[in-house]
């Protein structure tokens, strides 16, 4: 009889004749997008195939359902799973905690139904990815799940991975806020880790950036964790985070949280293997319809330039970011709504972000214009967040990399895409910056700028115009309101 057994909490093994393993392997393997451009493929060092199961039948535990389904489709339904090896089979359900939860002012928070649903799903399945949009309250979902695990007495060491130092601080602060009335001060059970900080503690919960711990050589460090959470899970297919999760060989509880997953087989297969199947608890549109998030209005603005011969993407971007008329137009958008705050997102720090910041600072001496990029320290970024939260007429000029995720500013009304992007994750996470409810706003606005260099004779679309059309398609699929405008920039 065929059997599926556990190697550890990261990997499982299909015990079967080589012929059957090869069948499964051939069905599950696939070529990722753009494989032909990979240097290893070009050099003949890689066949261009992603192989979720190896020649010995070993696969990531999160792919258990996929392997079982493939076996059954091939007619091998007579297989056995050692249920003692897989936590979802042998461990009884854990009940959600009934702790009293509060906000910063000590007011009682009643979790939304979708938050409780997410926690219950995580506690029942013990592996998987919770998909909830920005503003859905993922930190509360993590908090409730962790408290439930600790109360069960079955989990002694819990690791929470976040992508940035700012998120380490923010999540710790959120945990402390939620415990305002229940006596569970974060400092008494949460250990924060960042570069240069002590990696070990007697406390049960560690919050860390993956950058701070991925190069730890001592295997026992990762073996101490019996539960792992991965915030902003869409970043977890990087080799460093994969290495961490593979090393957590005793972490039988694994939950990821994200607002969006890439529509890419390589990405989804990797994350499913590391963490498990995904569960979408709600959508941005549903939360707006329920009044939990602010309604969104999108102004899609196409700037019609003189025809430009086809150039490489980098050269096209160089033209766009150095276009003085375009940058002045971006500045003019910040004059549309008095006493509101603006977030201007850019891609290139030296070529675009800093020149925009300098221009805005000179043009609007009575406004607070604040620059954010990777050079700005975490504590300064946190201070910028607080300034924006407490004031009006603030303009944040920030790089996508620093402000697309994990920044919580309720008093933010407008977002401007000063640089184009085609990344679905980047687009939706950036939009989410402005959707949190605040007494000063009834609507959040996105100004999505794009550039058309095709003219009348050119047959092919320029790169950033094609990316703009992809974004419009994304907005339409989400049923967002879009106002389309064309402006002559010739």
Model-derived features: where do they sit?
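Walker A/P-loop
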Residues: 125-147
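Conserved helix-turn-beta segment of the N-terminal RecA-like "Helicase ATP-binding" lobe
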Residues: 166-192, 363
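Conserved strand-helix element at the start of the C-terminal RecA-like helicase core
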Residues: 157-168, 319-328, 332-359, 475
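Post-DEXD/H (motif II) to motif III coupling segment of the RecA-like Helicase ATP-binding lobe
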Residues: 234-297
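Conserved helicase ATPase core of P-loop NTP-dependent helicases/translocases
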Residues: 189-201, 355, 367-403
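Conserved Walker A/P-loop ATP-binding site and its immediately adjacent core
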Residues: 139-144, 148-149, 154-177, 348-350
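Conserved segment of the helicase C-terminal RecA-like domain
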Residues: 434-469
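Conserved interdomain linker/interface between the two RecA-like ATPase lobes of SF2 helicase motors
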Residues: 282-342
